[in-house]
Curated annotation (Swiss-Prot):
One of its GO terms (molecular function) is magnesium ion binding. This is Digeranylgeranylglyceryl phosphate synthase. Coiled coil: none annotated. Signal peptide: none annotated. Pathway: Membrane lipid metabolism; glycerophospholipid metabolism.
């Protein structure tokens, strides 16, 4: 049993990304008027629930991962399934209990998110588009949760733009992931978009959404975001076009999805910096 295996199991880089998303949502909603206890608590709630979600997903996904990702902690035997299942339950419970300390709405969203993550891993993932929508929604809720933790003034309006952006970007990334995993998904009956309509059409749909996101990525600047956001998003968009939009095969999917993670993290940072009073 190694700490590294558990970090890999919970996808620690994704968990950190979720925490950053909460931070971004909070500072965008509050315009950097930070109440540390609220922010830290919200980041912990989202992080532990996200970690629990990644674990339970691997528990239910072990047969697919034996084909697609045999070196993951569970299919490789580095961590026992029973231990992973127990850890996911503990993390879910910790997140739900801590959410009560924020407000009733934070508790409700935390509870619904846990249920969504569990049933996504258990059944809904195999439904393809429905599963993709759940992943996109729960990812976007990380940013929304940051605004919810602030819960003052026009927090909903201020948090809505990054929340919607994260939703559609994550949805596209899930489509690309389906291209990467198409072989194992076909074997295990997972009805992803790539399995249903083919790789070429899935790439086309993904690129259409990305083009729309690129075109609309400048809108926040006209709603008060600063010049840091404008310059940064222009740079990220150019790289996105070169790395993702010009690719179209399975081999490219892995590289494209890897950059999309970097792009998503960069966008979160830019949303936060874009609300700095300069």
């Amino acid at each position: 049993m190694s700490v590294k295996a558990y970090f890999e199991l919970v996808r620690i880089h994704n968990v950190i990304g979720s925490a950053i998303s909460v931070f971004m949502g909070y500072v965008v909603a509050s315009e950097w008027k930070i109440v540390p206890i609220k922010l830290i608590l919200a980041m912990i709630v989202v992080s532990v629930i996200a970690a629990g979600g990644y674990i339970i997903n691997d528990v239910f996904d072990i047969e697919i991962d034996k084909i697609n990702k045999p070196n993951r902690p569970l299919p490789s035997g580095r961590i026992k399934i029973s231990r992973a299942r127990s850890l996911s339950i503990v993390l879910f419970l910790v997140g739900i209990v801590l959410s009560v300390l924020l407000n009733i709405y934070a508790f409700i969203i935390a509870l619904l998110t846990v249920l969504a993550l569990y049933y996504y891993a258990k059944d809904l993932k195999k439904q393809g588009l429905v599963g993709n929508l759940i992943v996109a929604l729960t990812s976007a809720l990380s940013a929304f949760y940051g605004g919810l933790a602030f819960f003052e003034g026009s927090w909903v309006i201020r948090t809505l733009i990054p929340t919607l952006y994260i939703f559609f970007f994550t949805l596209t990334r899930e489509f690309v992931k389906g291209i990467e995993d198409v072989k194992g998904d076909m074997t295990n009956g997972v009805k992803t978009l790539a399995v249903r309509v083919g790789i070429e059409k899935t790439w086309f749909i993904s690129k259409i959404i990305l083009v729309i996101l690129i075109v609309t990525s400048f809108i926040p600047y006209f709603f008060g975001f600063n010049i840091i956001y404008l310059i940064g998003i222009l740079f990220l968009d150019i790289i996105l076009i070169l790395v993702v939009l010009l690719r179209h095969d399975i081999e490219s999917a892995s590289k494209a999805r890897a950059y999309m993670k970097v792009y998503a993290l960069g966008t979160l940072i830019l949303f936060a910096l874009g609300t700095l009073p300069i």
